[in-house]
Amino acid sequence: MNLSLRLPRPFLLAALCCLGLSSCIVRMPNPAQPKALPNQSNSIDSAIRESTVPIYLLADSLHTSLALPYDWLIESGYTPPANLKFSPGPSRYLIMSWGDRIAYEQRRWLRPTEVFYALCMPSPAVTEVIPVSWKVEEVCYQQRIYRREIPQSHGRPLAHFLNASNRFDAQGQPRVIGPSSWGQGVLVDSPHSYYFPRICNVWTAQALESCGFSINIRKAIHANSLIKQAQKQGFSWVHRGHAKSRYGRDAAKPRDL
């Protein structure tokens, strides 16, 4: 997703004003109500009692997404877009994120006016769904990647949240509006509006929350703030990525490095 934040000063001032107006509606409506996730100190005991699955948190300079096991999502009740095609490979994951429709559809940097309207005015949003059949670290090698095992039973509230992020057609299938910004995935129409501060990282934060994590949504607007919350709850940094900005791979180092 391409989103340039180099705005003229009037646009920046307008964005700050918009923050005050919209701060009370940061969340997506109707999030799933999960059960609490066990503390990391009890994760081994939890794994003995119940099978676990890996989930991945991905981040570049500003944007976050999730990589989730496809078969587990289906078993948990997630309704995928029709005709997703997985290439031959050892595993099946969906790379998923949410955001402004224009930003996902464009193949160029957004103009300042487009950024202004995307951030400050309620605009159409999409969920990007990309099937991959290989190691997440190798497919998304440019991004910082964090991994955590969670109980399989936490998939149902997550599937509920993911389904609620999509608009469905008359046949009960997610309404596909175009190809994904990369890979062989799709963009799915979302019923929720995009604006600041309800941005991509809020969607990611609420998805993690639906898995049972304790996330402060207002502190998750910036990618690094969300990552730090995830690390405190057991996400381990498994791939450094290749981001080369002060917001990139070194901006949210694990505490033990």
Regions found by a protein language model. Give the residues of each.
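Internal catalytic-core helix/loop-beta-alpha segment
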Residues: R147-Q171
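Bacterial N-terminal signal peptides that target proteins for export
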Residues: N2-L12
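Long, compositionally biased charged/polar accessory segments in the mid-to-C-terminal portions
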Residues: I44-A47
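Core subunits and conserved enzymes of cellular information-processing
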Residues: I25-M28, P34-P38, V53-P54, L62
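C-terminal motif of bacterial Sec signal peptides marking the signal peptidase cleavage site
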Residues: G20-S23
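Glycine-rich catalytic cores of cysteine/serine-nucleophile enzymes that process amide/ester linkages
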Residues: I55-R148
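Second-shell loop/turn segments in exported
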Residues: C140-P151, V188-Y195
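Activation targets extended, charge/polar-rich intrinsically disordered C-terminal tails
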Residues: I25-A32, A164-L257
